[in-house]
Amino acid sequence: MKILLVDDERTEREGIRFLIEKFQFELEVAEAANGKLAMEYLQKYQDVDILLTDVKMPYMDGLQLAKYAKENRPDVIIIIFSSYSEFDYAKKACEVSAVNYLLKPIEVEEFKQVMEHVIALCRQKKQWKEQKENLLVADKKLL
């Protein structure tokens, strides 16, 4: 599984990477310093399972990025993290189908729980996709 971390602050990306390693999540980590670079990454690589993005960034904010991801890569699971605690931002995150909204500074235990949930969701989606493909193959054999 692959996660794309998007934040214009390198220390934030390093902190998230540290937590991923600390909890031994089996994730390949890719990074982007802003939404525009992340969008280009998503266009180039089809193997991103999780998009973890900040909201406020130069060139393209995280909500615009999440909207792009949902429209063009509907299987990607989106998590928004931000220092904005206003309800309006959380509402906008829901509108782009984010599965969670984490506040900065990241609470370590909350991050762990969210990531465990999202990784389980990724595994479940992959199983469903494999089952669907197997059923299609079996269906073709019957015809």
Task: For the regions a language model picked out, list residue spans one by one.
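Active-site residues of response regulator receiver
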Residues: D7, L51-D54
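Two-component/phosphorelay signaling modules centered on CheY-like receiver
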Residues: R10-A30
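Helix N-cap/capping motif at the beta->alpha junctions
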Residues: E31-E40, G62
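Short amphipathic alpha-helix used as the core "switch/output" element in two-component signaling
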Residues: E40-Y41, L63-P74
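Interdomain helical linkers/hinges and coiled-coil/dimerization scaffolds
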Residues: C94, I106-L143
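Receiver (REC) domain active-site loop signature in two-component systems and cognate sites
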Residues: M57
